[in-house]
């Protein structure tokens, strides 16, 4: 079953796993990093500075879960 998330601003992300969703965010990022794992860590750090949210970045599915928990992305039904 395909997952679908909406980001603030209306963009739609689709994938079969939460890792696919995290990677789609990485590909759309305006703050690229040399590798996906570095991007997860750097993005989690930026979110913490901007909003005070703690976003786990060690595993992509935790990253997506935390973004959704804080309302930064929304799972479509």
Where in this protein do the model-derived segments appear?
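Exposed boundary/loop context
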Residues: 2-3, 45, 64
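N-terminal acidic leader/helix
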Residues: 1-31
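Acidic, aromatic-enriched beta-alpha/helix-loop junctions
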Residues: 25-56
């Amino acid at each position: 079953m395909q997952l679908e998330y909406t980001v603030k601003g209306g963009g739609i992300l689709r994938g079969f796993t939460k890792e696919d969703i995290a990677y789609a965010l990485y590909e759309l990022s305006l703050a690229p990093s040399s590798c996906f794992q570095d991007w997860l860590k750097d993005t989690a750090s930026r979110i913490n500075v901007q909003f005070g949210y703690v976003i786990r970045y060690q595993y992509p599915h935790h990253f997506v879960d935390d973004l959704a928990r804080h309302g930064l992305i929304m799972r479509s039904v």
